[in-house]
Amino acid sequence: MGNLKQRLIKPGTDFNYAEGVKVKNASSSTISANKIVYVSGYEGPFLKVNLADASSDNTCSGRLMIAKHDIPGDGFGVVLPWKLVTSVDTSGVTAAGDPLYLSETAGDFTATAPTLKVYVGHAITDAADGAYLFCGEGSNRAV
């Protein structure tokens, strides 16, 4: 078993370094940073991911994660189970703390619940240059 030294553990301010998962982009298109993804399969020891959307059960089921950085098409990158996402437009929410849902637009979130309501986090601020906390853990289906 490996030995993890305390000095190598970084504090988690907007995400936790220790929870990052190395994945393979299953598509030939780049997945941009802060886009929401779902696990679509595996290749060797790596999970394969695609952009998630609320248009079909197939593209929004299971644990959702968020891209830490741009992941090149057919390349490798890191996804996170939670992250504080800043510099995004959250002006569509009524107030800070409002729930956010997976959008029918691949990889995005929306303040208006679509037909398939998949909860992905909540707004921290309601502004054109706002922030939200992504948390794709467990069953994301809103009731």
Q: Which residues does each predicted region cover?
A:
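Glycine-anchored, exposed beta-strand/edge motif detector
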Residues: 2-143
